[in-house]
């Protein structure tokens, strides 16, 4: 409609103006800390709004997400899953079933929890969505060092992930949605940190990649991409071959 077109143009104009003025602000450590704090506050608000919306649109899903949700409830009730062919075929759903069971048990034992224990699954996924937005914006800030681009990233990430239906579906997609971008953010920090922190960051990258990968193969894809890119970077470094091989060997050992 004509009204919606006007709103779209106004939104684009506001974003364009924000980008124009913010890109002129010089990037400093203080500015980065300030912007990170604002982004964190926006992401917390984003999480609370998502939880509020989810209370109005939540429903029971079928197919795989229904299977893992039912299994989590059965485990809490003391039932056994037996030798179900489902988990033999889709073994990647075993970890997410265990995760949902732990969350369900926590909510059930929490005095004064105001919702059905199953709602904690949705709350957890809203937190993961907010973490994905936060990590995405920080990654853009790290790479671009430009506040204008980072603000645009914050707006678009909030919109696109805000309308994501996965927040109300307790399944692997929502539970691991922040993992790939978190891995990329850690690798960006890895490239910029000194020697002492590098191997700790590398270990975290490998750990999170494998932790997410047992539930969603996308995390393995991200991890493989990071390793390949790092091998290329290592090949370009102007250091003696022996030192280069030692660093590569230690990274492989951590992997």
Please place each PLM-identified region on the residue numbering.
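Short, small-residue-biased leader/transition segments that mark boundaries at the very start
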Residues: 2-7
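Juxtamembrane membrane-water interface segments immediately following transmembrane helices
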Residues: 52-69, 221, 247-255
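Short hydrophobic/aromatic helix or loop-helix immediately within or flanking a transmembrane segment
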Residues: 67-71, 86-119, 123-127
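Transmembrane-helix signature of polytopic, membrane-embedded enzymes
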Residues: 131-159
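Membrane-interface transmembrane helices that cradle and orient dolichyl/undecaprenyl
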Residues: 144, 181-201
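Short acidic/glycine- and proline-prone juxtamembrane loop motifs at membrane-interface regions
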Residues: 166-176
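Perimembrane helix-loop-helix junctions
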Residues: 222-254
